[in-house]
Amino acid sequence: ATHLPTDSLIEFVHHFPFVLPELQAVGVRCTEVLVKRLPPRPDLGHLKKQAKTLLAQARAGDAAALARLAPLALPAGTDLRLHHTQWCLAREHGFASWPQFQAFVLARRALADDPQRSLATWLRWVYAGDIAGGADNARPEVAARLLDEGLVSLPADDPWIACAVGDIAVLQRASAQDVGWLHRAGGPLALPPLVAVAHSSLLRLPGWRERLHACARWLV
């Protein structure tokens, strides 16, 4: 591997060209996206070790390691820490932060360990614990990513699930068959339709917000 003098590390990281997703935290944009894929049963412990290894390599001046850190656009003179390399791994897999990435890894592992409960597991990321049960916070970015990657299969004509994702066409079909469902709690979490829409954490995501708002307007 090629090595650089210690005093050149941060300058190298700061100026090395890169191709990765939009870096919202530092205001950097690019036109091409390269996102790494996880195995079917990702191991969070292994990923943590990868972050530690990357940190050691970068501190040693390894050019390949520093090139991976370049998208972080760290200020010159930054003392590289573990949270920097964890953030790097998260970015490489298409996540804005390590906590988001960690949550996705745990969710994907849970789906792999118990595929029969995939819908119930997914709903725990859509709704906070006060709705879905437990003490966990909702993770809309995780729920959306699981859908995008085809890791969760939703019932096609369940109107309460449609409320969670803002599928107004399903709501309209359900009402044409039985208008009474609008006033009943139902679905896996036994929620009234409007509650299922209003408490869906997918409302926080721009790509989902308008469709959920449309469902809420239609329900009222």
Language-model-detected regions and their locations in the chain:
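Intrinsically disordered, low-complexity eukaryotic regions enriched in glycine, serine
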Residues: 16-18, 23-144
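Short alpha-helical "patches" and their helix-cap loops
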Residues: 4, 101-110, 176, 214
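Extreme N-terminal basic, low-complexity initiation segments
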Residues: 1-9
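Ankyrin repeat domain, specifically the short helix-to-loop turn at the C-terminus of the second helix
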Residues: 144-152, 173-181, 214-220
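Ankyrin-repeat boundary/"N-cap" motif
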Residues: 114-133, 154-164, 182-206
